[in-house]
Amino acid sequence: MFMGEYEHQLDAKGRMIVPSKFRYELNERFVITRGLDKCLFGYTLEEWQNIEEKMKSLPMTKRDARKFMRMFFSGAVEVELDKQGRINIPKNLREYANLTKECTVIGVSNRIEIWDRASWNGFYDESEDSFEDIAEDLIDFDF
């Protein structure tokens, strides 16, 4: 399980150090793709296979299902950690997530998310005040 928030930087070549706490679970290779809210999602290869199986059940007769699958899968790339624990984030994904030099990497249960730091801070500030309301509105879930 992934959890926590870490600040890292992109270098001039588009490489970013993956938080050491995430490296073990991700293994040497994992998948990153376009996420929601203009961030990137990162999945273990095993979790990626689970997602692929779920996506296969989406009805191809539904336009939105086709659009979502195209965006999600066309942006996916398998990345490999180098000896310094870095991954190379392709230009198209850096542009999608507006990644600049300063990044925030967060753990969200079964995935990691890579955010531009300013975007994450804005999202967090906007969401912080409504955190309890969101929890109440979602489902009856008890901690």
UniProtKB/Swiss-Prot annotation:
Residues 5-47, 76-119 form the SpoVT-AbrB domain. InterPro entries: MraZ (IPR003444), MraZ_C (IPR035644), MraZ_dom (IPR020603), MraZ_N (IPR035642), MraZ_sf (IPR038619), SpoVT-AbrB_dom (IPR007159), SpoVT-AbrB_sf (IPR037914). It comes from the Bacteria. Pfam families: MraZ (PF02381). GO terms for molecular function: DNA-binding transcription factor activity; transcription cis-regulatory region binding. One of its GO terms (cellular component) is cytoplasm. It is found in: Cytoplasm, Nucleoid. One of its GO terms (biological process) is negative regulation of DNA-templated transcription initiation. Gene3D superfamilies: Transcriptional regulator MraZ domain (3.40.1550.20). Keywords: Cytoplasm, DNA-binding, Repeat, Transcription, Transcription regulation. Forms oligomers. Belongs to the MraZ family. NCBIfam families: division/cell wall cluster transcriptional repressor MraZ. This is Transcriptional regulator MraZ. It comes from Staphylococcus carnosus (strain TM300).
